Curated annotation (Swiss-Prot):
Belongs to the GSP J family. GO terms for cellular component: plasma membrane; type II protein secretion system complex. It is found in: Cell inner membrane. Type II secretion is composed of four main components: the outer membrane complex, the inner membrane complex, the cytoplasmic secretion ATPase and the periplasm-spanning pseudopilus. Interacts with core component PulG. This is Type II secretion system protein J. Residues 1-7 form a propeptide. GO terms for biological process: protein secretion by the type II secretion system. Pfam families: N_methyl, T2SSJ. It is a single-pass membrane protein.
Length: 198
């Protein structure tokens, strides 16, 4: 009686190792693709969240706009290209509704606010005082990055206008156009309803 060995042959072992190696490479590739997709999804989600926060901040500001002149300006509302140190559009106005609980802070509830594009960043500028003293510096907040263009259009008297020349009145509506990397142009319309100028 000849006894046969019940182990694996060298060829069978090499074949099993080759299959295991191929499965391992496939698993690592799938894992890398999943991790890359997760990173891209997080980046896009963060970008969309920042865009939504920007438009929410603008909506909060524009919904509280008031027809008020600051001490050093003859206009109620200012908007133009390449103004306020902007690389494109800029807008400046007064708004009500800046919280001052029980009047404890040494300031008004009225705030002067501006938006401008500088170095591919959309900035919001505001002063601590209703009528800032000459030489006062605003608080500058970067509200959105990777912005290529910041455009404004104004609605009044039943039509849209590319420029606002009526310094003594507020427009009825405002169109904000942001050109973003990599999304392109995104437009948002705001209804301007002047509030109380207490």
């Amino acid at each position: 009686m000849i006894r046969r060995s019940s182990g694996f042959t060298l060829v069978e072992m090499l074949l099993a190792l080759a299959i295991l190696a191929a499965l391992s490479v496939a698993a690592v590739t799938v894992l890398q693709n999943v991790m890359r997709a997760d990173t891209l999804t997080r980046d896009k989600s963060g970008r969309m969240q920042a865009l939504q926060q920007t438009f929410s901040q603008m909506a909060a500001d524009f919904s509280q706009i008031i027809p008020r002149r600051s001490r050093d300006s003859a206009s109620l509302f200012f908007a133009g290209r390449f103004q306020l140190g902007s690389d494109d559009g800029a807008i400046a106005f007064s708004r009500n509704g800046w919280p001052n609980p029980l009047g404890l802070l040494p300031r008004s509830e009225i705030q002067n606010v501006s938006y401008r594009l500088r170095g591919s960043q959309l900035e919001r500028l505001n002063y601590d005082q209703q009528d800032p003293l000459p030489g006062s510096q605003p608080t500058v907040t970067i509200v959105l990055r990777d912005v290529r263009a910041f455009g404004l259009r104004f609605y009044a008297s039943g039509r849209w206008q590319d420029e606002w020349q009526q310094a003594q009145t507020l427009p009825q509506g405002l169109e904000v156009t942001l050109t973003l990397e990599p999304y392109g142009e995104i437009r948002r319309l705001f209804l301007l309803t002047p509030g109380d100028s207490r």
